From Swiss-Prot:
Topology versus the membrane: Multi-pass membrane protein
Keyword GTP-binding tagged: no
HAMAP family named in the record: NqrE
High-level lineage: Bacteria, Pseudomonadati, Planctomycetota, Planctomycetia, Pirellulales
Organism for this UniProt entry: Rhodopirellula baltica (strain DSM 10527 / NCIMB 13988 / SH1)
Disulfide-linked positions: none
EC code(s) of this entry: 7.2.1.1
Protein name: Na(+)-translocating NADH-quinone reductase subunit E
TM region(s), chain numbering: 12-32, 40-60, 92-112, 124-144, 155-175, 191-211
The protein's assembly and partners: Composed of six subunits; NqrA, NqrB, NqrC, NqrD, NqrE and NqrF.
Amino acid sequence: MVEQYLSVFLKAVFVENLALAFFLGMCTFLAVSKNVKTAIGLGIAVIAIETITVPANQLIYSLLLKKGALTWVNDYLISTDTYNFAEVDLTFLGFISYIGVIAAMVQILEMFLDRFMPSLYNALGIFLPLITVNCAILGASLFMEQREYPFGESVVFGFGCGVGWALAIMALAGIREKLKYSDVPPPLRGLGITFITVGLMSLAFMSFSGIQL
């Protein structure tokens, strides 16, 4: 059991890193990686959101959305001749359900940071509410559904996805701070050298792809 959880976690962090393997959440990844302190704050926020929303969406999927999930409703019906809930398939509601859960969690996190950590709240600015539509957050829930992780593994997977994304943005922020003091050719300054850096980081993480866990 522990080995399985460890395998899911390490794959989510290194082998299947959402930012550097699937290039999810690139908008926020590039925009908030100019400063290490801000990147750490956003990374922690993403870890919290992923750890909560992935298992929450797993419960919604397994108990309500997937085909046969509503079989328990038949126990409360007098007769199943008219309608049999065992045949109901609501997976088409997955996107809107997952986004609703993510939006609610981000709103709670936003209120928490505004109340207790106003400096970080102001530093993140518009990118904090944009976590709601960050495809890395939604992508983790969709991967969970596709791979049909049970609840325990979905918690570990969500945490691992958040840690992997946070690790990537903090590493990029550290490199970009060093690049400020480097002699970068004028045409490549700004996003140009940043794209090259992200590409090299992605190539480095590809070395983990051959690991079997």
